[in-house]
Every structure is written in structure tokens, then in C-alpha cells.
Swiss-Prot record:
Its main location: cytoplasm. GO terms for cellular component: cytosol. Gene3D superfamilies: 3.30.300.20. The gene is rbfA. This is Ribosome-binding factor A. GO terms for biological process: maturation of SSU-rRNA. The keyword 4Fe-4S does not apply. One of several proteins that assist in the late maturation steps of the functional core of the 30S ribosomal subunit. Associates with free 30S ribosomal subunits (but not with 30S subunits that are part of 70S ribosomes or polysomes). Required for efficient processing of 16S rRNA. May interact with the 5'-terminal helix region of 16S rRNA. InterPro entries: KH_dom-like_a/b, RbfA, RbfA_dom_sf. It is found in: Cytoplasm. The lineage of its organism: Bacteria, Pseudomonadati, Chlamydiota, Chlamydiia, Chlamydiales. NCBIfam families: rbfA. Monomer. Binds 30S ribosomal subunits, but not 50S ribosomal subunits or 70S ribosomes.
Amino acid sequence: MAENRRIQKVNSLIREAIANVILKDVKHPKISNRWITVTRVCLSKDLHTARVYVSIMPHENTSAETLKALKASAGFIAYRASKGVFLKYFPEISFYLEDIFSPQDHIENLLWKIREQDKN
């Protein structure tokens, strides 16, 4: 139980550090011009690897390009984030897209279609 609490705290610290690096230090045009939210971090039990889940706005066609740029910049992001988190080993990070907007978009599209049908 104490180990789970420790991993949760480290997840939170790493999430904040990575979010700050993406916001302040990354100058890549496909990253800096997007609204990127680090939604969660999942560390392995040995704390050597971390899956970083992000949501990207605008979401339409740019999220794949932005995710590719994040993956290419993962080493730089991990290096800069490691300066703000004091761990013996900073985990190797990999980025994954968390698609939290699709259900909302789907509902909004359905409502839009209903409104259009009511007008006709």
C-alpha cells in the first residue's frame, strides 16, 4: 500500500514536471503552438519507464503530428523534467494520445444534426 502511494506521488510530480517543460521549454512549432495537457502518467513498478498520456487541442488533424513531435522530443523533455524532480533515475518516457474529446464531439455532432432536422 505504501509503495502504491509512493508511485502515485511520483506520477504526480513527473506529470507536473513534464507539463512545465512542454509549456515553457519546448520550442518545436508542432508542439508549442498547440494546447497540450498531460492528463496522467503511469510509471512501471521499477520506476524506470513511464507512459505519459496527453490530450491535444485543436484535435482535428493535428494530433497525430503533435504526438509524433512529442515522441521525437521525449529525450529532451525527460532531460529537462529530470532537473525539477529529484529521483535516483528519471524514467524513460513515451507519449500516448488520450482521446478524451471524441465522446464529447460525437454527442455535439448528434445534437447539431437534431437541430438541423428540427429546422427542416
